[in-house]
Structures are given as structure tokens and as C-alpha cells.
């Protein structure tokens, strides 16, 4: 049967100097449009192993240009990292199903996998055909059932005598009732398996060279695919009409004082409206060089420091907040710079107080809580998010300090309802006096990326618990006494949020986003901790921020500010609100109610401009959903989110 080519790449169009944008660990905070791109291909995962993220490169030789994989997928102890993940690039259409794939490749070693990926859903769900050791093999790789161990099912294999450096020619024929694979026109494998639609890819756990890829389909399949795409586009068009569209409300040029991730919101002028605070650090680190306060009309209220200082591109988070620390009804701007805590008058930016911290430490977060039982969040919690906590009162006097084995951004919350806040940092929980209540980390085998609160519902029983983003150990549910209740293995969980994403079922849902080996994999779990939906965000790792867009009690979530890969998505992972393709900035985003109708606006910005979007039916009349969230004065880009129902 004659087939028509739908994809061809001999890599001749690639620049030998072209390398994919290297993962820097802050992909959820700073969106970069070309992340992982190398020609028509996309690097799908990253790993905490030197050399892994730079594995795919372009090589120009006597025989032409090739795509090469340069990394040996072993750890420092020569243990196989393929138990965790693989260097993979993918291309093509996620709806490809019945097709023929041909790949010419040259493995430079034989200890692990090298070959073709097809039926690709995400980094933990795909089919593989190629060489593995002294075999030619067909496998199905699927979601892990234990930490760091994706399930690999051998479908067919045959012994293979070969020498590293030999060029291989692989053919994969996918039909509805099975897969036929051929290596070097001689070794045939067949398995009756139904392969879901998915992209194609290249995989290698060892240095290898890929010379040519072609995908072809029957003309009838091409017509069927085009028809299905039209149907899906029409369905999406109808779905999008059900919700308020996004329109630009405000836009400002901020080149003179713009910043990276370091924006805060708060009512500085006591007029009932939030103002925007821009903080800029020096190139030397987290020392504050300037702060600018601007209202929602774009008017600069005041500036502090040296606005002419050079910007730090893609910098870390500066410890600064907007909060009424002394309880006089007027908010202050509080920040830490050069081992001193500074307090500025919110209305004017005038310095009110400056105190040197009792010991030198690298400060990463600044938060507030009620540790004295006064009914006000008048205590200052300072942390390096790694190993140290320091608590001050409103006069900036030390109340207590603690060292922890392994920390995270702290969460401040009154767990037992006694009027005094507790601190959750890493897997450790401290009471208001700094005494350790428990540490559940001894039961968990990876670092804590963050913690939030939820209720685990099992039948008639509902248990308040801490929910940890536990890295390779997935999501961990721990009760308020430190007992592990449930583990949900969904890959390396980096961020998570709890909100009412589905009003048709009881309880709150959890959305989680992965990194390190399963980048961009998003799971929607119900109140029992069972994953109900799985999707792959093309924006890669997402902060999973809930968005109260409709105001009817059901929230969406945002993946990124990009008009192509971003948007607001619903409980089923369907795009529900498109972001305008109008040239808006896409590097950073923030979610908050700015117009006063209880629904959220979205702020998109880079270092040169900031745009604000709202609903096209704003303001909303009648009862409007107004969820209860962690206070803005404890905001961090690293936080795990909680959005409790409220009207």
C-alpha cells in the first residue's frame, strides 16, 4: 500500500551550534518560549544529574548533519538512571496513530536502550522499539508503581549480535490491531496491542547518533486525521464560548523599574485598591537595590533605592512583603537586604526601622503569623528554605530559632485551632514556641518541595492532613500527628494546589505538576487522593495556581502566560479560556482579584512591561464565589496553594 510522507527530518536544517535551552530549575516561575526546542524536536524531560540536560546536540560530519545524544545515562555510582528516566526528544502530532515510522540511528554502546519512541503520551507512558543490550526489543513503558521505577512490559524480543558503531535501520508499522517492527530489514517482531494516538520520538541511554526520521501514513488515515482535528477544533470552540473571555484591562511600560519574579500586591494607600510593588535585586544576589510602588493607573507612588542599578535577569526570589505589622491599620513594606530587616512606610516609602539580624544567613523567605495568640499576624518568620528558621516579634526581637534537617518554603497555619500558629518547614512541624511536634521525613525518601493543607476523604471519614510535594515519592498525605495516611505515586511532584476544581463531586481536588524525569506531567486527583485525570502541559512544569475566573464556585488552573501553550484549564484538562495572541509578556504571572468583584484577574509581565487581564463580563452581578486563600503578605512563587470555598 502506498503511503504519503507526513514528517521527514534528516537534520540538515539544524545549526551545529544549536543546543536546547538548558533547564535551570525555575521553569515554573520563568516561562521561556523556546525551552527544550531543537529544530522540529522537543526535549521532554530533565534530571538532577550533570550532563543530562545538555544531552541532545547537533553534529556536522562528513556524511552530513546528525542529531546526537551525548550523555551516558548512569549516576555517579555507575547505576542506571534509566530506572528513573531517559534522554528523549519527541516530534510530530499527538493524534498520530496508524502510521509507519522509519529511523536510521547508530548506538555507540549496548548497555541500555537506543531507538524509536511511538505512541508517546508523556515521559512515563510510551512504546519503545530498538536495541537494549544484546537484544532487539519492543516494550511498553508506563506510570511508576514504586518511586523511581517506571513499569516496563516486554511485548516481544529477539537476540541480536551487533557491534557498537553499526548503523541501524528501524521500521515501526502501527495498525489498529497490532504493531509490526523490523530492524535492519531482517529481524521482525509483532505484537497484538492497541497503541493510543501519540507523538513519535528518539531515545537513547548511551551516546548515539540519529541520521534520519520519516513518518508516513495512508491517504485515508490522513483524511481521517484531518476530519478528527476539525471536529475537535469545533468542540473546543463551543466549549470556550461557555466561559467569560479574557480581555486586557490595564497595560504599563515598566522598563525603568521592571523586575523578574519579584512583584507583590497590597493596599499601600488605604483606598481599598491593591497597589503593585516591584523589587529589584543587584547582580550580586538577593540584596535589594530598588523598590517601586505603582497604582493600578500606572502612576508611580514612590521609589526606594537606586533605580538605575543593573537588572538581574531571571533572579531568585527577594524576601519582601506588604503587611500591617504593627496593627495601626497602615501597611508597611518589609524586606531583608544585606542581613538587615528594613521597614518602609507603605504610603510614602519612607524608612521606619532597620535592624541587623542576630546572625548571618542567606534569607530566602519572609512571612508573618500569629505565634503569640494576639489575633494578629504580628510575628516575622525568616527562613533560608533549607535548614534554618528564625522568628521575630513586631519589634524585631528574636523569639526563637530552629535548625532543621531539610526544609522548604515554610507554611504558617493554626493546625489545632488553639489561636497559635504552627510552622511546617520541610517534613518538620513546630509549635508556636519553636518546639518540634513531629518530623515525618524519616518515612519519605526524597526532599520536600512544599506543603499545603487538604482533607483526605475515605468513605464517610474525612481527615484534615498535610499534603506534601515529596519529589520522587509523589504526593504524601500526613495527618496532624505525623502519621502517613496515603502515598500517591505520580512522578516527581514539584508543585501542587488544593481547590474546588469540580463542584459535581464532594470535597476538594488536588492538582500536581511534575519535574525531573516527568516534566510537565499534571495529575488531577479527587478528595480520596485518587488520580482522575492526567495531562501533559506543553508549558512544562506548572505552579498549578487556581483561578477563580467564573465566580460560580468552580475554579480553573493556569499553566503559563503563553498564548500558545498556556491558558486556563478545567477539571478535565480542557482549555477553557484562551489567552489573547496580542503580544503580551509571558515570562511571569500572578493571580489575584484587582477589580473588586471577587473574581481573579491575571497579571502577565516581563522586565519591560506588565499587562493585566480580566473577564469580558466584569463586573459580575449577584452572589460571587470568593475563595479563602493564603494571605498575600505571605505570597511566594514557590508556595503550594490552598483555595477554600467561600462566598
Regions found by a protein language model. Give the residues of each.
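Beta-propeller-forming repeat regions
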Residues: 1-50, 54-55, 60-61, 65, ...
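Secretory/extracellular carbohydrate-interaction modules
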Residues: 71-144
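Beta-strand-rich recognition domains
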Residues: 96-97, 109, 162, 174, ...
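Trp-centered recognition loops
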Residues: 97-99, 104, 157-171
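Beta-strand signatures of extracellular beta-sandwich domains
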Residues: 117, 137, 180-182, 292
Amino acid at each position: 500500500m502506498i503511503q504519503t510522507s507526513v514528517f521527514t527530518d534528516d537534520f540538515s536544517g539544524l545549526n551545529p551550534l544549536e543546543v536546547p535551552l538548558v533547564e535551570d530549575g525555575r521553569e515554573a516561575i520563568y516561562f521561556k518560549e523556546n525551552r527544550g526546542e531543537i529544530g522540529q524536536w522537543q526535549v521532554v524531560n530533565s534530571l538532577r544529574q550533570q550532563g543530562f540536560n545538555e544531552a541532545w546536540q547537533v553534529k556536522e560530519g562528513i556524511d552530513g548533519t546528525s542529531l546526537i545524544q551525548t550523555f551516558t545515562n548512569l549516576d555517579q555510582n555507575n547505576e542506571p538512571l534509566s530506572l528513573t528516566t531517559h534522554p528523549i526528544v519527541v516530534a510530530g502530532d499527538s493524534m498520530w496513530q496508524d502510521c509507519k515510522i522509519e529511523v536510521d540511528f547508530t548506538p555507540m554502546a549496548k548497555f541500555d536502550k537506543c531507538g524509536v519512541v511511538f505512541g508517546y503520551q508523556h515521559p512515563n507512558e510510551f512504546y519503545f522499539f530498538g536495541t537494549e543490550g544484546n537484544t532487539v526489543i519492543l516494550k511498553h513503558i508506563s506510570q511508576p508503581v514504586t518511586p523511581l521505577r517506571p513499569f516496563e512490559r516486554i511485548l516481544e524480543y529477539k537476540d541480536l549480535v551487533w557491534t557498537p558503531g553499526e548503523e541501524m535501520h528501524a521500521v515501526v508499522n502501527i495498525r489498529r490491531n497490532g504493531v509490526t517492527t523490523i530492524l535492519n530489514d531482517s529481524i521482525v517482531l509483532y505484537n497484538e496491542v492497541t497503541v493510543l494516538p501519540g507523538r513519535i520520538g528518539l531515545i537513547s541511554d548511551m551516546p548515539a547518533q540519529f541520521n534520519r526520521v520519516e513518518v508516513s501514513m495512508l491517504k485515508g488515515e490522513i483524511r481521517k486525521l484531518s476530519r478528527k482535528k476539525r471536529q475537535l477544533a469545533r468542540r473546543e470552540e463551543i466549549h470556550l464560548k461557555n466561559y467569560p473571555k479574557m480581555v486586557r484591562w490595564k497595560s504599563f511600560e515598566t522598563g525603568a523599574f521592571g523586575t523578574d519574579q519579584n512583584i507583590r500586591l497590597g493596599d499601600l494607600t488605604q483606598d481599598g485598591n491593591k497597589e503593585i510593588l516591584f523589587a529589584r535585586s543587584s547582580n550580586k544576589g538577593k540584596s535589594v537595590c530598588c523598590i517601586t510602588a505603582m497604582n493600578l493607573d500606572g502612576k508611580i507612588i514612590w521609589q526606594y533605592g537606586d533605580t538605575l542599578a543593573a537588572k538581574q535577569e531571571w533572579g531568585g526570589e527577594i524576601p519582601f512583603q506588604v503587611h500591617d505589622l504593627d496593627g495601626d491599620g497602615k501597611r508597611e513594606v518589609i524586606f531583608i537586604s544585606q542581613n538587615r530587616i528594613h521597614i518602609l512606610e507603605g504610603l510614602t516609602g519612607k524608612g521606619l526601622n532597620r535592624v541587623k539580624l542576630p546572625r548571618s544567613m542567606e534569607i530566602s523567605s519572609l512571612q508573618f503569623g500569629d505565634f503569640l495568640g494576639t489575633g494578629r499576624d504580628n510575628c516575622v518568620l525568616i527562613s533560608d528554605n533549607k535548614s534554618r528558621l528564625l522568628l521575630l516579634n513586631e519589634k524585631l526581637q528574636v523569639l526563637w530559632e530552629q535548625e532543621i534537617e531539610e526544609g522548604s518554603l515554610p507554611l504558617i497555619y493554626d493546625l489545632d485551632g488553639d489561636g497559635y500558629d504552627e510552622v511546617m518547614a520541610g517534613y518538620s512541624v513546630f509549635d508556636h514556641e519553636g518546639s518540634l511536634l513531629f518530623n515525618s521525613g524519616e518515612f519519605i525518601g526524597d526532599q520536600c518541595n512544599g506543603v499545603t493543607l487538604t482533607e483526605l476523604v475515605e468513605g464517610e471519614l474525612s481527615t484534615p492532613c498535610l499534603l506534601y510535594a515529596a519529589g520522587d515519592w509523589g504526593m504524601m498525605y500526613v495527618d496532624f500527628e505525623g502519621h502517613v495516611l496515603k502515598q500517591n505515586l505520580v512522578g516527581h511532584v514539584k508543585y501542587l494546589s488544593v481547590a474546588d476544581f469540580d463542584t459535581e463531586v464532594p470535597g476538594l481536588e488536588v492538582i500536581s505538576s511534575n519535574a525531573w524525569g516527568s516534566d510537565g506531567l499534571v495529575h488531577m486527583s479527587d478528595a480520596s487522593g485518587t488520580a482522575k485525570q492526567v495531562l501533559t502541559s506543553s508549558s512544562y512544569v506548572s505552579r498549578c495556581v487556581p483561578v477563580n475566573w467564573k465566580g460560580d464556585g468552580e475554579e480553573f488552573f493556569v499553566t503559563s502566560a503563553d498564548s500558545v501553550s498556556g491558558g486556563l484549564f478545567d477539571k478535565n484538562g480542557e482549555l477553557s479560556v484562551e489567552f489573547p495572541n496580542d503580544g503580551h509578556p509571558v515570562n511571569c504571572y500572578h493571580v489575584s482579584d484587582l477589580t473588586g468583584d471577587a473574581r481573579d484577574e491575571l497579571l502577565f509581565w516581563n522586565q519591560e512591561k506588565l499587562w493585566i487581564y480580566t473577564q469580558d463580563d466584569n463586573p459580575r452581578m449577584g452572589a460571587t464565589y470568593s475563595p479563602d486563600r493564603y494571605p498575600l503578605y505571605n505570597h511566594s512563587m514557590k508556595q503550594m496553594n490552598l483555595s477554600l470555598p467561600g462566598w
